[in-house]
Amino acid sequence: MTFTVTRERAQWVHDMARARDGLPYAYGGAFTNNPRVSTDCSGLVLQTGAWYGGRTDWVGNRYGSTESFRLDHKIVYDLGFKRMPRGGPAALPIKPVMLVGLQHGGGGVYSHTACTLMTMDHPGGPVKMSDRGVDWESHGNRNGVGVELYEGARAWNDPLFHDFWYLDAVLEDEGDDDELADPVLGKMIREIHACLFNQTASTSDLATPGEGAIWQLHQKIHSIDGMLHPIHAERRARAGDLGELHRIVLAAKGLGVKRDEVTKRVYQSILADIERDNPEVLQRYIAERGGL
């Protein structure tokens, strides 16, 4: 069952890892409360899963090995690990806090594992669900260093690995992340919402007396469209735009969107004006359309 990791817990996990970054590799070892005590690859991965899960029995407890995953040992599942589906993380219904890669060669030096902590972009960064994550690995010593965090550590999907798992856990408030928690952004959203949906009064000279604040912004925009488009269409029709003239003809015949008698008379009057002032435009329209 998927469990939830608090942000405080995720921060603690990263703090524990940072405190052990740079330790020498310790085959068969296990982390303890002493940050100078090291472990090997599987100890690191399994104990990190226990950290995320809030287990209290992790001190000096290796839990298993790389082969514990391959052999489906119960402890692996008890810690919360599950096999990655064929489609990878994209096929999961959640965004896991930890991803794991394994190489199986029979155990010992012939097997390896590493993980990526997905609850931070980089060491010391804020806790958040990350696309990149922080790689975390214990490997053979290089210049005396075996445990590495981020720089020098393999990612969960390194080409070395061929078996992939994830910790069935999510970060709390995963979908809400930081963006909407930003007070500046929140203020902007409230202001935009107010502009769009607060009701205001009409500023027209012909507004109905006593009408008050009844109009939302989108209604005023629709009103502007309703007022300006007919004016624009009439001007273009008088100048010879037969497409706009056709709109006016339809409205005058009661075939437009609005078919009331007042609307028809308005556009019949416009046609009469065009016939009086620009008869050649109507003649071209009739020639093309075969009549009004």
UniProtKB/Swiss-Prot annotation:
Please state the Enzyme Commission number of this protein. Answer: 3.-.-.-
Q: What class of enzyme is it?
A: hydrolase
Q: Does the keyword Hydrolase apply?
A: yes
Keywords on record:
Antimicrobial, Bacteriolytic enzyme, Cytolysis, Host cell lysis by virus, Hydrolase, Viral release from host cell
Q: Name one GO biological process term.
A: killing of cells of another organism
Any keyword Transferase?
A: no
GO MF terms listed in the record are: hydrolase activity
Q: List the disulfide bonds.
A: none
Family per UniProt? Answer: Belongs to the L5likevirus endolysin A protein family.
Query: What task does this protein carry out?
Result: Endolysin that degrades host peptidoglycans and participates with the holin protein in the sequential events which lead to the programmed host cell lysis releasing the mature viral particles. Once the holin has permeabilized the host cell membrane, the endolysin can reach the periplasm and break down the peptidoglycan layer.
Protein name per UniProt: Endolysin A
Q: Which organism is it from?
A: Mycobacterium phage L5 (Mycobacteriophage L5)
